[in-house]
Design a protein with these regions (language model features):
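N-terminal acidic, proline/glycine-rich, low-complexity intrinsically disordered segments
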Residues: 1-15
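Gly/Lys-enriched N-terminal cap/neck module of very large, oligomeric protein machines
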Residues: 19-144
């Protein structure tokens, strides 16, 4: 029987069988995505709740997270009048987490992972999408 995981300290077993905490998304920066002109959202470990009035940008916040996770981008998400939308996520990485599958995928694609991993998605008004992680451009599918 497996023990339940604490939502504030998600863990996985590395190759040597020891547990390590997961990298966690600490900051999301959003520019020109839907109704959001420019926003920075600082997240904390555990549960973060996003609330607001109709039209405040809650859906665009969820869309920004989906872009960071490699979802297909839609040109209609770009703010009217803007050339492109940009979403940047900062993941906090603890020492010794390089064995995590997502971090290995970024390193295998040429990205650099240190105490934080910066992931960026740019979506043009024409629908083209570019992804970068760890300072290196890479295929969007690497983020998935």
């Amino acid at each position: 029987m497996s023990r339940p995981q604490d939502a504030t300290n998600s863990t996985h077993r590395n190759g040597s069988g020891t547990e390590q905490s997961e990298p966690w998304l600490s900051t999301v920066e959003i520019s020109n995505l839907g109704v959001i002109h420019d926003a920075t959202v600082d997240l904390s470990r555990g549960l973060t709740v996003i609330t607001g009035e109709t039209g405040a940008g809650k859906t665009m916040m969820v869309q920004s997270l989906s872009l960071l996770l490699g979802r297909r981008a839609e040109s209609g998400w770009v703010r009217h009048g803007a050339d492109s939308a940009v979403v940047t996520g900062v993941y906090e990485v603890s020492p010794g987490q390089t064995d995590h599958p997502a971090l290995r995928a970024v390193e295998d694609a040429g990205g650099v992972v240190e105490d934080e991993l910066i992931v960026t998605r740019r979506v043009s008004a024409a629908g083209r999408s570019v992804a970068a992680a760890g300072g290196t451009r890479m295929p969007v599918r690497t983020l998935a």
